[in-house]
């Protein structure tokens, strides 16, 4: 038994979609979450800067005595995950491979779409992972840089959000049977995305898929938490306004949480 928390990092609130699934599947595990909303989005930033910011988040989580770090951010996974994984002596998990694997299982026509931040799409990481495992699958990637600001400003239900999503996804409509939400912010726009793409297109939440791998690693390294612990205290940190973060988090997690401000 290992009662240390699992650390989650993201550029903002998007990683809460992963946390929500982890709380559902592994309610006995403690969580420490850091969202860098003050510097979001990461997608348009240079690689060097994304690496620098990611390491700051990692180092913060290490001060919290975490037993595992989850990159609940596709951009950070694409740019810095391999480097961090090689440098640390605790398990470090990203969201890309679980999402790619789920897309391969889902597609029936071999036509997969991937939407993400400009950096995630430019890295071509999803296409590489998918075609490494299933070379015959055609992958269409599309950067959606306006999605993260919508979520970070809590405007997911606005008419502007609907128009932006509709206009952004137009190039993929009718051309794919599976769509990877290659940014953990995007599931917060899922109803609009599904409506635009149509009911026949399967949406893959890369973050939710990641939780299955978390469970496997906890077992493999024998670091599961206390299964009998009922009241688990999580900690949430943000580099921006805690009230805005708390508002979004409480809606998504369906519980009121306390959010602490941190300066990196």
UniProtKB/Swiss-Prot annotation:
Listed Pfam families: Asp_Glu_race
Keywords: Cell shape, Cell wall biogenesis/degradation, Isomerase, Peptidoglycan synthesis
Disulfide pairings: none
Binding-site residues for substrate, renumbered to this chain: 10-11, 42-43, 74-75, 184-185
Domain of life: Bacteria
GO MF, one annotated term: glutamate racemase activity
Chemical reaction(s) catalysed: L-glutamate = D-glutamate
Keyword Cell wall biogenesis/degradation: yes
Top-tier EC class: isomerase
Keyword Isomerase: yes
UniProt record, GO biological process: cell wall organization; peptidoglycan biosynthetic process; regulation of cell shape
Regions annotated as coiled coil: none
Active-site residues, Swiss-Prot/TrEMBL: 73 (proton donor/acceptor), 183 (proton donor/acceptor)
Family: Belongs to the aspartate/glutamate racemases family.
Function comment: Provides the (R)-glutamate required for cell wall biosynthesis.
The name this protein goes by in its record: Glutamate racemase
Taxonomy of the source species: Bacteria, Bacillati, Bacillota, Bacilli, Lactobacillales
Gene: murI
């Amino acid at each position: 038994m290992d009662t240390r928390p699992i650390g989650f990092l993201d550029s903002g609130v998007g990683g809460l979609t992963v946390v929500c699934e982890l709380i559902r599947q592994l309610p006995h595990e403690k969580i420490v979450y850091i969202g860098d909303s003050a510097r979001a989005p990461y997608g348009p930033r240079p690689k060097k800067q994304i690496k620098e910011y990611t390491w700051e988040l990692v180092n913060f989580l290490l001060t919290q005595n975490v037993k595992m770090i989850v990159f609940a951010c596709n951009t950070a996974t694409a740019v810095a995950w391999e480097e961090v994984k090689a440098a640390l002596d605790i398990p470090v998990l990203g969201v890309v491979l679980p999402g790619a694997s789920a897309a391969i299982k889902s597609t029936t026509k071999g036509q997969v779409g991937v939407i993400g931040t400009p950096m995630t799409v430019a890295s071509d990481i999803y296409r590489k992972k998918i075609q490494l495992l299933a070379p015959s699958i055609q992958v269409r990637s599309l950067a959606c840089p306006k999605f993260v600001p919508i979520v970070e400003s809590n405007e997911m239900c606005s008419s502007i959000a609907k128009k932006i999503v509709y206009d952004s996804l137009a190039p993929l409509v009718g051309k794919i049977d599976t769509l990877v939400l290659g940014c953990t912010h995007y599931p917060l726009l899922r109803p609009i995305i599904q409506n635009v793409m149509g009911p026949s297109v399967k949406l893959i939440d890369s973050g939710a898929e990641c939780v299955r791998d978390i469970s496997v690693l906890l077992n493999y390294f024998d670091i599961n938490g206390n299964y009998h612990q009922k009241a688990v205290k999580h900690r949430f940190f943000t580099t921006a306004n805690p009230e805005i973060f708390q508002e979004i988090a409480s809606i998504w997690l369906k519980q009121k949480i306390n959010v602490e401000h941190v300066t990196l």
